[in-house]
């Protein structure tokens, strides 16, 4: 097995060998990790462990990859706040209502509002944002907001090897994966 990408740590080599013994194809994990200098972000050196945050800034976390550019373009970052609802006027989003760090309700008017609160938080805010012009919740004329949620659960497996494999280094959840069992197949006993 030859993993010729930047995350070719020993644990990935062992997993690639196991996949190949079983006849499974494997791929390098798609990772938002830079392998060279990019702004304030340094290239990955596989120092690990990525799941606890990257001490070099190689991992594309929101604070390094998006906020600096957004704030340079005029975005304002309000921390320790919880959005309670999205405000609309005549079927147009005009801002948000939030609770600030002191527990006070604040209103922020904005020309643009980006809603990115994951599958559950986004639906929650859309439903909490019901108003006269959207009585069933914002963007919910179909009554489907908050329904048909689909999760992509994952499993974490830890292995013990006879030799040292640097298992703590590189991207979280190793650096290769296989989708041999991605498609539904009732003959395997599960869907």
Q: Model segments located where?
A:
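Redox-cofactor-proximal catalytic regions of oxidoreductases
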Residues: 1-2, 47, 162, 179-184
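Conserved redox-cofactor binding core of oxidoreductases
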Residues: 1-83
């Amino acid at each position: 097995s030859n993993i010729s990408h930047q995350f070719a740590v020993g644990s990935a080599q062992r997993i690639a060998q196991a996949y190949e013994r079983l006849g499974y194809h494997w791929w390098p994990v798609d990772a938002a990790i830079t392998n060279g200098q990019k702004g304030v972000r340094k290239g990955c050196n596989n120092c690990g462990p990525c799941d606890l945050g990257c001490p070099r800034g190689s991992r594309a976390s929101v604070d390094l990859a998006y906020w600096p550019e957004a704030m340079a373009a005029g975005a304002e970052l309000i921390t320790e706040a919880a959005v309670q609802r999205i405000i609309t006027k005549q079927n147009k989003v005009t801002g948000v209502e939030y609770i600030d760090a002191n527990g006070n309700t604040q209103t922020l008017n904005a020309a643009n509002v980006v809603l990115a609160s994951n599958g559950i938080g986004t639906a929650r805010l859309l439903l909490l944002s019901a108003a006269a012009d959207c009585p069933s919740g914002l963007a919910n004329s179909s009554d489907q907001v908050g329904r048909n949620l689909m999760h992509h659960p994952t499993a974490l497996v830890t292995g013990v090897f006879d030799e040292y494999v640097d298992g703590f280094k590189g991207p979280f959840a190793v650096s290769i994966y296989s989708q041999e069992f991605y498609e539904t197949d009732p003959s395997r006993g599960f869907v």
